[in-house]
Every structure is written in structure tokens, then in C-alpha cells.
Amino acid sequence: MDPALARSALESGLNAVIAAEPEVTRYDTVVGDGDCSIGLKRGAEAVQQLLQSSKLSSVDDAALFLDQIIGVVETSMDGTSGALYAIYLNALASGLRSQSGQSEARAKVWAAAAKSAMQSMAKYTPAKPGDRTLVDALAPFVDTLTQTGDVHKAAKAADDGANSTKGMKASLGRTVYIGGQGFQEVPDPGAYGLAQFFTGLAQKL
């Protein structure tokens, strides 16, 4: 992995998450307790600070790159979504390490690791597409990346997946307990925020 390209793409994704904070807050105020955007923004800003500290300037190993990001995510994001991100990223790093000797196209290596990470995350959460969670954006991204090797198509699939949660009744998460009809009006905040990250990421790849 080209460190400069990786940082540029990650920075773009993080900027997209931060820019989406008002919209995520609006959605979460309708169907949640309004703290989803706080966690996402806090995590994004913490990773930005790491990138700007130049500690990653000499990193040319993708798994090691992720390890440093994971450390920040684990300390800056709380709640269920923070735990899921940490679990997924740890599994993603492990998946990349298992393929370190392969000569496949870079996107295919990342896709295989991403798919493996999805399987690992499933051991810790019952969330699946259709449950109105961040998985509604993550799963189509991983599936499309696996099928096509195209990050832009994968990001579009994530965006479509997030938008599909509008009107979807929640099976998991706080929305289940809050109830009401707000879910008919807005997409899942976590899925929307993650889709924005993927869209920003793809713009630099």
C-alpha cells in the first residue's frame, strides 16, 4: 500500500464523516438519542489527529497501518458501534496479514480481508442486512468490492444500502426501544454515517 495514497483516502473519508455530522445528528434525533453522530465525529477527529501527527509517514504495511488506527478507535469511540468498528478493523488487519504473501490485485486482497472480517464480526453481533444498522451499509460495500474489485461501485452500494433503511423497522439497537414512526422518515444514522465515509474514501482511490 502506498502510504501517501492511504492517508489521502482515509483523510477524505474522515472529512466526509465530519461533514455529515449535522445530518447524522438530525436522523439520530428522530430515531435514537442523538449520540451516534458524536461518536462518529469523535472517532473521525481522533484518527485525523493521528494522521496529522506524522506517526504514519513511514508506514508501508497495511496491517500495521490499521493497527495504529484501531488503537485510536478503541479509545475514542464508545458504545456498541465503537465496539463493532474495533472488532471489524481488528479482523480486517488479521485478514490482511493472512494474505501478506499474495500477488493478487490490491483491491482483491482488501476485498478478501473485508469479507473475512465480516464473518468474524458476525460472531459478536446478530446484525445482518435488513436490521437497520451500520451493517446495511457495510455488507453491500464488502459484497460489491468482493464481486467487482471496484471501490467506487462498492461505495455506491453502501450508499444505496444506507438509503434503503429509510422506512425499515429496526430489529436491533436503540430504535427498537424508542419506537415511534420516525424510522419511516429517515435512514439509519449509523449506516448513513458509514456510507459517507466510504464515499469520501472512494473519491481518492
Protein language model regions, located:
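N-terminal loops that bind phosphate or other acidic moieties
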Residues: M1-L205
